[in-house]
Regions:
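Short acidic/histidine-centered micro-motifs embedded in hydrophobic/aromatic stretches
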Residues: 52, 169-173, 240
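Active-site pocket-lining segment
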Residues: 284
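Condensing-enzyme catalytic core mediating Claisen C-C bond formation in acyl metabolism
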Residues: 1-23, 27-28, 134, 157, ...
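Active-site-proximal alpha-helical scaffold in enzymes
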Residues: 84-114, 145-179, 219-225
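Conserved active-site "lid/cap" helical segment
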Residues: 1-87, 95, 155-162, 184-193, ...
Length: 284
């Protein structure tokens, strides 16, 4: 309990191409998180709120945090929007833990939201494109899939991995999705289907790339000292880490080594005073 914070509730919507707008998605995920708290929770006790979103479609981009607080049923609470591309949710959680650890609040709300499917392909490409390097990579015509296609090609060559091995990851991911009623894709695929899928950015095929999706997820955090007022099974956050790296891939000494991930993981292990060998479950 080194960070003195614990998760006491969580809720999410189904992910996929859904008819709900961003307001409804936020409301649903927050309501489900509050309902999941074993002994109930008075929203008036929430002292801080953090929203992670890239802001697709122009949905209240300039002041999404105020919209978040309103839809969460906590208008007036200090709310912050955090946009760090794919790491937005992790950094929002870190900010909430820091707020609790500092004593600024005993309860914090963290939500992640994207509404991506009902805007044009051109607008989606723009928002994804400006999440990477815009001075060099974007001007050269590189997309996110293109960047990771280059990284994957180098990795396969560097470690003598056959391209067919990538299909096993897609098969595993779809098998997990088939068991999750909230997953975007809820059916298994065969290795043959993954290998035969159209190429997006060689060696990455259709099943190797993430889809655009709609959905929201929320967690409620409490201080470690008060967590058991709300539940007998709080999930204590023992370690947390964050880092950054060169934005442009060509500036990285070795593109296949994600140094930000390594540094963040090292910081989390140090905070929790444990090693990778101590873990029984990991998700990347």
């Amino acid at each position: 309990m080194g960070l003195r914070a614990a998760i006491i509730g969580a809720g999410q919507t189904r992910f996929g191409a859904v008819p709900d707008g961003p307001r409804a998605l936020l409301r649903t995920s927050v309501d489900r998180a509050v309902a999941s708290v074993d002994r109930g929770l008075d929203r008036d006790r929430i002292g801080a709120a953090f929203l992670a979103t890239l802001g697709f479609g122009g949905w209240q981009i300039g002041n999404a945090a105020a919209l978040f607080a309103e839809e969460a049923g906590i208008p007036g609470v200090a709310a912050v929007r955090i946009e760090n591309a794919c790491a937005s949710g992790g950094f929002a959680l870190q900010a909430a833990v820091a707020a609790i650890a500092s004593g600024a609040t005993e309860l914090a709300l963290v939500a992640g939201l994207e509404k991506m499917t009902d805007v044009s392909s051109a607008r989606r490409r723009y928002w994804l494109g400006v999440s990477g390097d815009t001075e060099w990579e974007r001007q050269a015509g590189l997309t996110f899939a293109g960047v990771y296609g280059l990284i994957a090609s180098r990795y396969l060559a560097l470690h003598a991995v056959p391209p067919e091995a990538l299909a096993e990851v897609a098969v595993k991911n779809h098998a997990n999705g088939a068991l999750n009623p909230n997953a975007h894709f809820q059916k298994e695929i065969s290795r043959e289907a993954a290998l035969a899928a159209p190429r997006v950015a060689d060696p990455l095929g259709l099943y190797d790339c993430c889809p655009v999706s709609d959905g929201a997820a929320t967690v409620l955090l409490a201080s470690a000292e008060t967590a058991r007022r709300y539940t007998d099974t709080p999930v204590y956050i023992d370690g947390l880490g964050a880092a950054s790296d060169h934005l442009a891939v060509q500036e990285r000494p070795e593109p296949t080594r994600f140094e930000a991930s390594r540094r963040a993981a090292d910081a989390a292990f140090r905070a929790a005073d444990c090693r990778p060998s101590d873990l029984s479950f990991a998700e990347l």
